Amino acid sequence: MASISINCFFTPQALARPSRTRKIFAKPDKVSGRTRSPRKTKLQREVELKSRGGDKLQPVSDAGGEATTYTRLPPREDYYDVSLLSSSYLKVSEEVKLSESNVARVEEKIETLREIEEEEKEKEVKSYDDDDIWGNYRRLDVFEGSSRSIDEDDEDWEDEVFEYGDETDAEKDDSEGSELKDGEVLCFSGEEEEDEIGVKEKGVPAVMRCFDRAKIYVRAGDGGNGVVAFRREKFVPFGGPSGGDGGRGGNVYVEVDGSMNSLLPFRKSVHFRAGRGEHGRGKMQSGAKGDNVVVKVAPGTVVRQAREVGSEVEGEEGEEKEVLLELLHPGQRALLLPGGRGGRGNASFKSGMNKVPRIAENGEEGPEMWLDLELKLVADVGIVGAPNAGKSTLLSVISAAQPTIANYPFTTLLPNLGVVSFDYDSTMVVADLPGLLEGAHRGFGLGHEFLRHTERCSALVHVVDGSAPQPELEFEAVRLELELFSPEIAEKPYVVAYNKMDLPDAYEKWPMFQETLRARGIEPFCMSAVQREGTHEVISSVYELLKKYRAANAEPKALFDQANENLDHVAKKIDKERRAAINEFEVFRDSGTRAWHVVGAGLQRFVQMTNWRYMDSDKRFQHVLDACGVNKSLKNMGVKEGDTVIVGEMELIWHDSANGSSRPTDSNKTSTDSVRWPQWK
């Protein structure tokens, strides 16, 4: 098959839209003594496509007029060569002999076409690099390179092949792979890659997570900026300032939602930001308040402030983080972060001495923090025990809960809650916790993730598997894990329920188990949760313990009333810190440098709210530094000409004037060349 080689030079414009080159193919008159058919059959095109792609044809029997065809495709040569297969394998493969010679003739015809194609490729002009061309673009040969079969009648078909740049890594890999000898198999081992990357530590699968811990980011809204405006009205020549104040930023609230039983919503929603207050306007119009944001949590959520990255307390395992809020009952609502105050407009700065103030404040930035949320289920009774002891079955019998029940350990992966009703006004919430193993207090198994849920339970039910080899040891192991995790949990009242009495093994071991526990002063109960036998006695006994516990510990209600009164104590504390007096500050010097730091919550807030676009703001700032005693403290500590004074986010340069007065000036300000104001450095 003939082709035309075209040499072309690429320019940047040509690369953007290369010209299309038509290829002209010469039609051979005869191939192997036969006239070529006007159109190729589908079989011919597929075989020709395979031959052009570089794949070897499958072996054909040498017998004249007969071809060997497999009922299934032979193995790919990318993995191993067919020639390596033994003759026994070929005999086992099912074969079909074709008496007609059509297939053999097609194969013969294709071999002839391949020979002609190889001869034509040898005559083609190879591409070469032309280093003398500006732009260092490559001189290329456009030649036949299509792997698609071409019909005679397909005259409008065009093929274009372009190369640009050096050979890619993928092409190099392909060329290296093509140099393998016949019969060679290239194997890749994942051990080297595993050694380089290392074994990553996997966490608990998503299906096994309770989502009782979460870390979220909350930020109150910033206050709106004040505006500098003046009254412009007909027949009012001196209207005076009319700039309004900015609106207050939105608050961040935490509210208990009774419909939630986990912290799953915080898996994807992590950031909670309140709206910013609107800026002030003319005509004494104040900006609107920003939108509040409400973070809804499940009952029993404990809110702690997360440790900041790089803090000194980070990494200390023994120290508990401070508890900000403990929300137990649905409907509780606490103000966590108050919004920033809006900046004042120029109307707020007018006075008898300054009737035309050209000054306004920025809005106060809203506070922000990272919070650690921990959920402790609020349940009256907790069901504990070893895996596959029948805890979920007991919960499904005594309540309307439908936990997953199966005859294998760790069927329960998440805590389940159920409500048990005795009378119209007598109910109790029962929690089914996953099974505990030896070492659960150290994090072994699933127990460490859920043991803390028992801290809020008033009573416990120990379910013992009667079919276990030694039920007494199983009971003692669970008790030991509870004591090691928290001695307070071990001191809570509990009831022992000996389960699976419907099994012969459990029935035989019951007398010995009962005698062992009675010797320790414990009266156990026997039951069969599957048969619903003995469960009423167990729950009735637990309910009696619960009533006694509530009567003896009547202070939780008082604590609840006190908590309702102090739910906003976090916001009050933050607001008090932000309202610190401006004269409360500390000055210290960096060792080895000429930098002085003035640290104070009031001063930092003042610097942040100062709008430095107005010259009156600079004058006011210098006056505040003199009034609160910053300049005096710096001179007493030995500040010198040219030293850097850092107040909040501002860096100033200290200068001593000729008349003996000293003051820091802003190092970031440009020169104003004003007669009234000194030149800013």
From Swiss-Prot:
CDD domains recorded: Obg
Superkingdom assignment: Eukaryota
Reported tissue expression: Specifically expressed in leaves.
Chain segments carrying region Disordered: 25-72, 657-681
Location relative to the cell: Plastid, Chloroplast stroma; Plastid, Chloroplast inner membrane
Pfam families referenced in this protein's UniProt entry, alphabetically: DUF1967, GTP1_OBG, MMR_HSR1
Biased composition (Polar residues): 658-674
Primary location class: plastid
Amino-acid positions noted as binding Mg(2+) in the UniProt annotation, renumbered to this chain: 392, 412
Cofactor needs: Mg(2+)
Domain OCT: 577-656
Keywords: Chloroplast, GTP-binding, Magnesium, Membrane, Metal-binding, Nucleotide-binding, Plastid, Plastid inner membrane, Ribosome biogenesis, Transit peptide
A Gene Ontology biological process term: rRNA processing
Keyword hit for ATP-binding: no
Residue positions binding GTP: 385-392, 410-414, 432-435, 499-502, 528-530
GO cellular component: chloroplast; chloroplast inner membrane; chloroplast stroma
Role this protein plays: GTP-binding protein involved in membrane biogenesis and protein synthesis in chloroplast. Functions in the biogenesis of thylakoid membrane and plastid ribosome during chloroplast development. May be involved in the vesicular traffic between the chloroplast inner envelope membrane and thylakoids. Possesses GTPase activity in vitro.
Family matches, as NCBIfam families: Obg_CgtA, Obg_CgtA_exten, PRK12297.1, PRK12299.1
Recorded family membership: Belongs to the TRAFAC class OBG-HflX-like GTPase superfamily. OBG GTPase family.
The name this protein goes by in its record: GTP-binding protein OBGC, chloroplastic
Organism from which the protein derives: Arabidopsis thaliana (Mouse-ear cress)
Gene: OBGL
